[in-house]
């Protein structure tokens, strides 16, 4: 037997030791206290890991060890000016190498001192900032876990976002653990909502779109029910909606007849090219809605069908029945949360469907456990990899070899074009999609002799039009 002691691989423990032994540890702690006071004074809202940790502290739990240095991520309705102001305060208090720079995430400004990041300020439009639910922890406002759920679902919806550290590698495990903690300590109560339904028939393309919204819920529910019958499990008693559907298809189109809530009769589809699909289907565009933060993309509305644009992203999808394409359950959960936030009058309806979708996943998990016991490991792996109820990297295809082009990538490309003074070829997919970088926030370094940038306009840059506002279409 070896006489060597068993090694201690407690990463959190050694991270705390490393932080305390840093040469500038005292200065960093002092800077973070200035940031904390600034957050309280300006009534900004913490989000991300720090907000989850503080919310869990209120329930006697946590995700970070006691004493770990806080990583302050905050929402602000005026994040550029707030970031500049925080930099000025730090500089005036004698901190060195203070600066504010635009982050990779275009709606975020980062503040640093002595080359250590001490604050991330992200833009949230006033109409959302003033209405989102919050909690209070030690005088700090933190985003409510109900809202935080949306960001956790988001990573599962776009597995190839944020290359070269794609979410499927860098976020899936961490976000799933955090989601389970939120669900444990902050479950959304199940409040039944009675809805009246009407049968609606739609004809849609076979390959270019993924069925979304209430229709996707109906398809997933019936797929679950068929799996239950296959597993010979008795019918469940449930108060959740049990809509039905039928369909037939040809080589190009699907004709779908489905029970839709009378309050929301429009079919919702996700597609990489909404305007092209609308034109191909011969529909009339009536309204366009800007994104709602990161949680809902641009929406192109016609009278009977609403198209969620996934342009520049690769959306995770499920395949059910006879190769019907449906959004993943995670994107459906995100849709119902978005509906609860964006339409307060129907919040209870959307949260009821959110819980209903969680119930579907819970029951699907129990059925998968039955199948796993009845099949070989190889057979179960093949079955699970095609199940619409598990996390997936199967994505909705686009017309290019590459589909994921983040705002950061497009800004970088626009910078290259500006510096080289060589425009992209007209045949390049992004030739008409590069942002105007002259309208982006400028970096700011107090004490370097340059005046503080002024008059940043949120309205002049489409990347900051993320309040969910809808306007009639001119088409």
Swiss-Prot record:
Catalytic activity: RNA(n) + ATP = RNA(n)-3'-adenine ribonucleotide + diphosphate
One GO cellular component, as annotated: virion component
Major localization listed first in the record, in broad terms: virion
Pfam family, one: Poly_A_pol_cat
Keywords assigned: ATP-binding, Late protein, mRNA processing, Nucleotide-binding, Transcription, Transferase, Virion
EC number annotated for this UniProt entry: 2.7.7.19
Example of a GO MF term: ATP binding
GO BP terms in the entry: mRNA processing
EC primary class: transferase
Keyword Chloroplast: no
Stored InterPro entries: PolyA_pol_cat_su (IPR045355)
Induction text: Expressed in the late phase of the viral replicative cycle.
Localization per Swiss-Prot or TrEMBL: Virion
Function: Polymerase that creates the 3'-poly(A) tail of mRNAs.
Family under the similarity heading: Belongs to the poxviridae poly(A) polymerase catalytic subunit family. Highly divergent.
Name of the featured protein: Putative poly(A) polymerase catalytic subunit
Organism for this UniProt entry: African swine fever virus (isolate Warthog/Namibia/Wart80/1980)
């Amino acid at each position: 037997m070896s006489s060597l002691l068993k090694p201690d691989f407690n990463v959190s423990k050694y991270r705390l030791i490393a932080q305390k032994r840093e040469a500038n540890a005292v200065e960093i702690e002092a800077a973070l206290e200035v940031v904390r006071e600034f957050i309280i004074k300006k009534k900004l809202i913490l989000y991300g890991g720090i907000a989850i940790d503080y919310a869990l502290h209120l329930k006697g739990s946590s995700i970070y060890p006691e004493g770990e240095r806080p990583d302050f991520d905050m929402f602000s309705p005026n994040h550029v000016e707030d970031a500049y102001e925080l930099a000025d305060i730090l500089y005036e208090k004698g901190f060195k190498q203070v600066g504010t720079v635009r982050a990779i995430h275009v709606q975020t400004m980062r503040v640093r001192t002595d080359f250590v990041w001490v604050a991330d300020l992200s833009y949230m439009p006033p109409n959302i900032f003033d209405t989102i639910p919050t909690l209070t922890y030690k005088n700090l406002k933190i985003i409510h876990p109900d809202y935080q759920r949306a960001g956790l679902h988001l990573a599962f919806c776009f597995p190839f976002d944020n290359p070269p550290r794609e979410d499927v590698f860098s976020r899936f495990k961490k976000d799933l653990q955090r989601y389970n903690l939120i669900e444990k300590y902050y479950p959304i109560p199940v409040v039944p909502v009675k809805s009246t339904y009407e049968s609606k028939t739609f004809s849609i393309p076979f390959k270019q779109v993924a069925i979304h919204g209430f229709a996707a819920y109906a398809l997933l529910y019936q797929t679950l029910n068929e799996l239950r019958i296959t597993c010979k499990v008795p019918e469940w008693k449930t108060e959740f909606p049990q809509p039905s559907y039928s369909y037939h298809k040809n080589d190009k189109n699907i004709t779908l007849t489905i029970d839709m809530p009378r309050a929301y009769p429009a079919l919702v589809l996700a597609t990489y090219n909404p305007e092209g699909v609308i034109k191909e289907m011969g529909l009339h565009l009536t309204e366009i809605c800007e994104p709602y933060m990161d949680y809902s993309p641009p929406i192109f509305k016609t009278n009977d069908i609403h198209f969620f644009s996934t342009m520049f992203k690769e959306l995770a999808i499920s395949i059910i029945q006879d190769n019907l394409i449906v959004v993943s359950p995670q994107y459906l959960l995100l849709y119902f949360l978005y509906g609860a936030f964006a339409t307060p009058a129907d919040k209870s309806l959307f949260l009821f469907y959110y819980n209903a979708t969680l119930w579907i996943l819970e029951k699907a998990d129990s059925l998968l456990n039955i199948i796993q016991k009845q099949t070989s490991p190889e057979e179960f792996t093949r079955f699970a990899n095609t199940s619409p109820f598990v996390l997936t990297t199967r994505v909705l295809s686009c017309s290019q070899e590459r589909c994921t082009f983040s705002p950061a990538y497009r800004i970088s490309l626009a910078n290259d074009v500006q510096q080289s003074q060589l425009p992209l070829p007209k045949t390049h997919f992004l030739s008409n999609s590069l942002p105007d970088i002259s309208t982006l926030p400028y970096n700011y370094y107090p004490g370097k002799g340059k005046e503080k940038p002024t008059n940043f306009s949120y309205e002049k840059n489409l990347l900051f039009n993320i309040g969910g506002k809808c306007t009639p279409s001119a088409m």
